[in-house]
């Protein structure tokens, strides 16, 4: 489940028109959602509030195994349509398998005029979080320098403390500041990174083959207007060929080095993904005359599929993953990792199963069972009420997690087990409850 701060950050990217998916760091995002999901540890509670469209607050507390908490504040320069935990789209709060929309060049903001003069307004986001009792402080500043360039500054301040080590965050990082510059033109996306702690410089590049998408591309699961999709040939669409999968290919690489640590690293990756969740191919879109008599479902052409491969020549690590949605509510993923130097390997399998409300007919007053009458318009409330994720690997690690909505709260419950240990088969179990309001 996404933390409230991550949900606000994604809403900020969406409001400013920035495509966070067109990054080399997110090349394996679809398979990671199923194979690398994070199971909560202990008891974790989060309460957040949006007093207005620009300012947000969030409070979190972990009661088990140790007691600690944090306070966070978020401020944005633009209005964000942040929902409450009771009415937010459930899939927007879950890291899930998804065929992401085709990349496109970011568009500039609309011009604003005041008293006959153009107002130069730059979007930005400020985020800060203070942890208790460790005294650690996290900060993030994100701003758009131009329609295609975004800058991020992240800082961590972790002062020395006399607090016992068991009360401190296990993943705590020393004080550091990192600069990140992203340049996205749709077909290419480049990242430049600098870290002050170890003096590390890095660059990442992602190239998308084929033509760019349209600016009015339809989101996953969303419906666009008919006049925008009927008889429109998608720009990256190829001619119909029997057999095989149709989609797009993306390739990328990263290079980083540190003069202070006298170390360097390099990796490369490739991704193939189909496009059934975006604008359907033109031959699958029914015309205005035949749409009512012979509708065609775009999802029946090919299953949503993502295939990725990564290679790190310096560490000798190779990884290949295959992820596909085999039905409306079930997605499966498999990944094989291999090291060419040590010959160590690992095979990981995972599944994602969505739970929906049952629409069973109810008996009427006369005792007869009548089928439910479909409403004249689609209901505004989605029928998804939860998701179950499972993961197993050849290292005998098995993880199971359920995420759902109970009344106005988002709940995550998970367990991690190790079948190779008879003395302690359950490694971790946790419960996370999140509530946030925008009223």
Curated annotation (Swiss-Prot):
GO terms under biological process: establishment of mitochondrion localization; mitochondrial genome maintenance; mitochondrial outer membrane translocase complex assembly; mitochondrion-endoplasmic reticulum membrane tethering; phospholipid transport; protein insertion into mitochondrial outer membrane
Residue ranges, annotated region (Disordered): 275-305
Compartments (UniProt record): Mitochondrion outer membrane
Membrane topology according to the record: Multi-pass membrane protein
Stretch forming the signal peptide: none
Main location, first listed in the record: mitochondrion
One Pfam family recorded for the sequence: MDM10
Biased composition (Low complexity): 280-305
Superkingdom in the source lineage: Eukaryota
Keyword annotations: Membrane, Mitochondrion, Mitochondrion outer membrane, Transmembrane, Transmembrane beta strand
A Gene Ontology term for the protein's cellular component: ERMES complex
Disulfide bonds listed in the record: none
InterPro entries found in the cross-reference section: Mdm10
Record's comment describing the protein's domains: Lacks alpha-helical transmembrane segments, suggesting that it resides in the membrane via beta-sheet conformations similar to those predicted for other outer membrane proteins and porin.
Function: Component of the ERMES/MDM complex, which serves as a molecular tether to connect the endoplasmic reticulum and mitochondria. Components of this complex are involved in the control of mitochondrial shape and protein biogenesis and may function in phospholipid exchange. MDM10 is involved in the late assembly steps of the general translocase of the mitochondrial outer membrane (TOM complex). Functions in the TOM40-specific route of the assembly of outer membrane beta-barrel proteins, including the association of TOM40 with the receptor TOM22 and small TOM proteins.
Assigned protein family: Belongs to the MDM10 family.
Complex and partners: Component of the ER-mitochondria encounter structure (ERMES) or MDM complex, composed of MMM1, MDM10, MDM12 and MDM34. Associates with the mitochondrial outer membrane sorting assembly machinery SAM(core) complex.
Protein name in the entry: Mitochondrial distribution and morphology protein 10
Organism: Laccaria bicolor (strain S238N-H82 / ATCC MYA-4686) (Bicoloured deceiver)
Gene from which the chain derives: MDM10
